[in-house]
Amino acid sequence: KSCCPNTTGRNIYNTCRFGGGSREVCASLSGCKIISASTCPSYPDK
């Protein structure tokens, strides 16, 4: 599961993933976090 701070971050993450980037790289680029829990710790998943 990925958690992003805002819609822009989510869009960057999704575009990066669609382009073939790894979850770790895309999360780093977009400011998102990859977590194993089902809910995001510090901000809602949009």
Curated annotation (Swiss-Prot):
PROSITE patterns: THIONIN. One of its GO terms (molecular function) is toxin activity. GO terms for cellular component: extracellular region. It is found in: Secreted. Keywords: Disulfide bond, Plant defense, Secreted, Toxin. Disulfide bonds join 3-40, 4-32, 16-26. InterPro entries: Thionin, Thionin-like_sf. Transmembrane segments: none annotated. GO terms for biological process: defense response. Pfam families: Thionin. Its main location: secreted. Belongs to the plant thionin (TC 1.C.44) family. Thionins are small plant proteins which are toxic to animal cells. They seem to exert their toxic effect at the level of the cell membrane. Their precise function is not known. This is Viscotoxin-A2. The gene is THI2.3.
